[in-house]
Structure formats: structure tokens, C-alpha cells
């Protein structure tokens, strides 16, 4: 189904499109769909967003007054059109939303310019794309009609349901929420219409938790992955490395988890090393020039953890053909790093290879390797069966630690992963070496072998940015922002968690890493880590090209490609590498004096475009603003989902312990109360100011505390207190506490 956004995106990418060509691009063949397209085109013309020239071609009006934005609403009903980080938000009054909902992509027209500290005001003229096709709602009867009332109070509409949906009327005891599919969005004087597709009875019932949280995060799996075919790979020249030992480091337990790369090590006599990273050859298996494949991939850009399982973004057929299996030959796309005796990277090269997995390295292996007392005598029952591989594994772990040490010296920050004591959430807390949306590193952890894979893959991903950028190729990736933006005043608020004996360096400073280590108490340390994590912004995926803005030219870029089984970003970067290896031009003209463009030694020798126009056109379909925006939208939903899934399971845990009393620490203080972490349970809850009935408490922002007017009793971050669990709200993921 096409959207207004897809019409405008197609028109923006061309000088002019005839009606038939537009239909072809939008895959419209049915008369009913063409009728809808006609209505949309007429409306867009009247709004002066597009026009039709004398050649009967549709084009976007370049200097239109309309701005593309996303609607963001608060629970109190205030709505803004958000344009971007550098642009000012536009305030939209409720009566000027024209039924745009929170999260919708819209075209906004400014009707009143901003002045002083007031935001500009605007009106929504066109809804480009709806973010909600499924609504979680309560069913209520209003004037004998049946309506779905969204549980998300940022959505300011109700949906009319058929009479037969009356049986789903909300009962507080059952907490019976329904999933409503929208048949027609509200427009003009017409109400929105929908129908119930599923009832979720949430009260003391964990069966529907995953379904509930996925729907609340707007992640709807309405597509069939089996339609994503696995291509048969062509016979190509590959380096045969099947006689060498390759190691697959894996902590994830689910069979459905993302496929991981393998590491191979070759130690030379002069103490230099060849370090190979072998990645699953998905770029060869998936036809990224096929509209059918892209249509499926665009509906789910990333694999995500469920309870004790994963929702993979790739079909089972593709995974079966590409996954590295023990003692089986596999085709791979590989990077070879040449390291000196100090584990510094001297040069690198990309290759097509044939490999074989010798050992699946588990977390018990890394723990035994890193905690053993003697390196000459093997006594561990875990290590005895893998005795022949220990020398290689020791070297891989040494290289991983060297790389990480270098990253920290360059200014990166390491924070340990939060603790988890809920068995169902185990896969959520295992380190994901493909995750770069966080602004910090998770610490190397001998109990999680994937953390040691992470620092090696980080280098491999940095290298693809350097290589692709030198050739003027686009890539999808992240900017490493450093920590300059972190608010020092917020960190000062957490001083209650830090020991008093702080040592400053000769410049009178204390590094961020030192601050993290200054807390002695384990419970306080864990809470400090949690608070510090909140100070880091999430990184967004960026379209990286040769023409980097001046203010970004000194920043560190990373272009992930090593785990294409995790997400679309890795896949398209790997696809670019694959094309460089098999289709890249090796000389300026007719292969005279060809050079190996896959080697780092060739980077300064190439002064020509390495791809012809056909390959460049295929890559342009993948590397453009539209795709990057979609990737970020999906990534935002997935991050919301993961956070909410953890929260609902914590609430479920507290639900079984109502009335119990626990010790805790104050995490943060607000005008309406303070949040407390119960260390024993690893859950957080709110003590509302209204429950502090022994005095009138006021919030002092400078000191970040609540203080009683009469008693002068204060509550601040880091205070140890005792609380009772009095109430939980599954729908809002909230735990209410009171002081004892």
C-alpha cells in the first residue's frame, strides 16, 4: 500500500514523473488503488505541494512553504512538529492537528513566527505517513456506540468499532486491553473506524506481555519472511582457509539469535600476527536489487530479542545457508588485519574466502581462560577438551584487550552492563557486539565472551569507513561523539554515590573513567552506572559520504558491516564491500596495470570511480536519506521495545511482592516525588510526594532535593531508605512505593 510520503519521495528523486511511471514505481496496478492515487495527487496539487507541468509530469514544488516534520505529543495534550536536531520545533494547537497523531510524519505550514522564547506556531496540512496501524485500546460504550479509547494518552482520537466488539468492554479486574486495526483514520467530520483483532487479558497473566509491548512500541510483524529467498551463490575465486582454525565466540543461547562472525589467528615468527574476521556471506545470498526482497526487509530492519528467543529479520532459508556450523565448510566475506608485535594494525585487505568453524567458544571458556592460575598446566575440566586451541584463544583475547585499551586512551568510556536476575530476560542482557547506538562501550566481561568479540569488530568496522571514504563510497554508520556533551552538573548530583578520597591528576582534573571507579559499595556502584548511562545520548545512523561537513571532519566514524545477520545497516555495508571485491574497477582504463583495490596499500593509488553507473545506481537505492530515516525510525522503536520489555518484567516481579518492605537508594528527585531502586530486586519505583503526609515538601532544583517546610527533613539522590511496594500499573510499567 502506498503512502503520501512514498509519492513525495518518488517525485523528489526525479525531475518529473509521468502518471504511468509513478504508478509503476509505487507498484499500483488495481483500478481501486489508481483511484486513491488520483485523489491524493489532486489534494497535493491543491495544497501546492506538487504541480503538473505542460508535459503532464508531476514534480514537487521546490520552494514550497511546507516543512516535513514528525508530530510529538505530551500526555498533557501539547503537540509539536519536530523537524530535526538543529531546527526549532513548531507548536501545533490541537484544533490544527487535522487528526495527526503522535509519531506521524506530516507536512506543516508555519502560520505564526516564533519570537523571544516562544516557538513558531503551525498547522498540519498533510499527513505523509501514519506511525500507527494497530492501536492498543480500552473498549468503552459512549452513547450506545462502541469505541476504542487508546491507552496511549498522546493519541487524541477515539476509534468507532462495530457493535459486535461490545463483548470486549474494558473491565478493570481483567485489564483486558484490545489490539485494534484501523480501517479508516478520522478525517474531516468523519470518525475513525476500526475493529478488534485480539484481546489481551493482562491482569496476573504474563502470556501476552511480548505481544502487548511489541504493539505498544509499534512493531507489528505482518509480513512473511519465507518470501525472502536465499540465492544460490555463483562460483567465484575464494581463498581456501578451511585447513586453518576459526573460532565462533557466542554467548546468545537462542538458535534464532543473529549469526555471528568467526575469528582466525595466524601468529608469525617475528611476533607479528594475521587476524582474520570471517563474516556470513549474506550480501551474496540476498538479492538487494530485487524490489520484492527490499519490500520485505523494509518492514523489519533488525533482529530483536523476545523472551528466551529472537525475532530474526532474515528468513530461515537464508540463515541455514549462511550460518557458520561446526566442522562444515562455509563461504565468507573476510577482512585480514596485519598486526605488529604491539598489536597495532599495519595494513588490511578484504577477501572472498572458504572457511570452517573449528570451535564454538562459549562464556565458560573465556572465564576459564582468563581466571586460570597457570598457563603451562591445564587443570580446568572446561579447558581440557579444547587444549589444542588455547594458544590461539589466548592471543585473540590479548588482541581484544589491547584494542579496547587503545579505545579508552582515545577517550571512549566503558561502563559495565546492568545486572539482570530475571531469567526470561537473559538474551536482552547478553552483550550485542553489533550495537553502536549507545554512546559508550560495555566493559569486557569474562562471563560474556561476546564482549571480547566486540572490540575486534569495532576495529573492523572503523576500517571499512576509512576504506570506503577514501574511495568516495557512501556507507551507513555512526559518529563517535566523545563525551564533551555530557552534562557535568548532572554527574555532580550523583556525588553521594562516590567515595570522598578523590585523586586529581596534575592538571587538577579527574577523568570520566576514574569517576566510574570511585564508588566502593557494589550496590551504589551499580546504581551510579545506571545513572551515568542515562547521561549518554543515543547515536543515530548517518549516511556517510566523502563530503563530510566541516564541523564533523575531525570526528570518528564507524561503518558496521561485520554482523549482517543482525540488521540492515550491516547488510548494506557488506553488500558494498562485496561489490568492491567482484565489480570494482582495478585500473583507470581497460585493466591496464591493475591494482588490488581491496588492500589498504592501494588507497592512495586510486584516482577513479571504482564502480560503473549500473552498480552506483543499485547502491544509490540502498544508501539514501529515505532508507537512513527508516532505519532510525525502526531503531527507535526497537530501543523503546527493549526498554519497555525489561520494565514490564520488573513490574511483574513487583506485582507478586505487594506489601513487602525493602531497603533502597534514591535514584532521582523530581517535583512530584522521588524514584527509588530496591537493590535486592533490581527494580525501581516512585514514592509520590502526596504520600509524604507528615509535612509539606517542596522541590529545590539547585540542590536537587525535596525538603519539608516544617521538619526540614530532606530527600536527595543517594539517600538510603526503606520502602513498601503498594501498587503496580502494568499498562504504564509503573511501581508505586511508600516510605515505612
What do the predicted segments below correspond to?
Residues 24, 164-165, 179, 185-186, ...:
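Electropositive polyanion-binding surfaces
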